[in-house]
């Protein structure tokens, strides 16, 4: 009976230690240094669950989870110290043009895929107060955010997908004007 208990607790301790888990660490101690690189290797329209475990660190990335990616869980080591950040705002010019970004291109994270979960992570747009600056843009369906911090100033979370469902549990969402729209 003791052997059985040891096996069960070893399995519980290695929750993310399986072939369907990718590891990200900014300091280079994992197979990926950037979250975007881990997202890029995920297969389109997966029928199985894929976990991307992100170790503590500051990840300055503008992430898009495209519509063809499904069944992905992005899990941070802890919400306070696992941070995805970017600093675009509505008055930044689109590279190579004389047009400004406007609100909807300023996201730090844009989720177009369905059945995507974020846990224990901070998503922030840390742009100065120079205009709208979206931290999270949700377009996919059945999106789940658990124990996440979503931080910004104006227009922090955009839930603009038509006929989509987004669930926030034990999350802290912070902003100023229209911080959830």
Please give the residue ranges for each predicted region:
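Short aromatic-glycine-(Arg/Gly/Cys) micro-motifs in beta-strand/loop hairpins
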Residues: 11-24
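Acidic Gly/Asp/Thr-rich repetitive segments characteristic of extracellular carbohydrate-active
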Residues: 22-53
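Short, internal active-site loops enriched in acidic
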Residues: 57-60, 143
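Bacterial Sec-dependent N-terminal signal peptides
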Residues: 1-14
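Right-handed parallel beta-helix
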Residues: 109-181
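Active-site-proximal beta-strand/loop segments in catalytic clefts of secreted hydrolases
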Residues: 27, 55-57, 171
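Short, T/G/N/S-enriched strand-turn elements that build extracellular solenoid repeat scaffolds
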Residues: 33-44, 59-68, 74, 84, ...
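Right-handed parallel beta-helix/beta-spiral solenoid domain characteristic of secreted/periplasmic
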Residues: 26-31, 51, 70-132
């Amino acid at each position: 009976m003791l052997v059985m208990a040891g096996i069960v607790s070893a399995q519980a301790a290695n929750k993310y230690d399986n072939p369907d888990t990718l590891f990200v660490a900014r300091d280079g101690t994992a197979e990926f240094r950037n979250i975007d690189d881990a997202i890029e290797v995920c297969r389109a329209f997966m029928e199985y669950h894929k976990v991307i475990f992100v170790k503590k660190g500051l990840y300055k990335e503008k992430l898009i989870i495209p519509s063809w990616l499904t069944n992905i869980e992005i899990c941070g080591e802890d919400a306070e110290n696992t941070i995805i950040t970017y600093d675009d705002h509505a008055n930044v010019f689109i590279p190579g043009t004389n047009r400004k970004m406007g609100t909807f291109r300023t996201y730090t994270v844009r989720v177009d895929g369905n059945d995507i979960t974020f846990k224990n992570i901070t998503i922030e747009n840390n742009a100065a107060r120079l205009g709208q600056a979206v931290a999270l843009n949700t377009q996919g369906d059945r999106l789940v955010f658990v124990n996440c911090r979503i931080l910004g100033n104006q227009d922090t979370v955009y839930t603009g997908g038509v006929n989509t469902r987004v669930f926030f549990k034990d999350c802290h969402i912070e902003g100023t004007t229209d911080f959830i729209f």
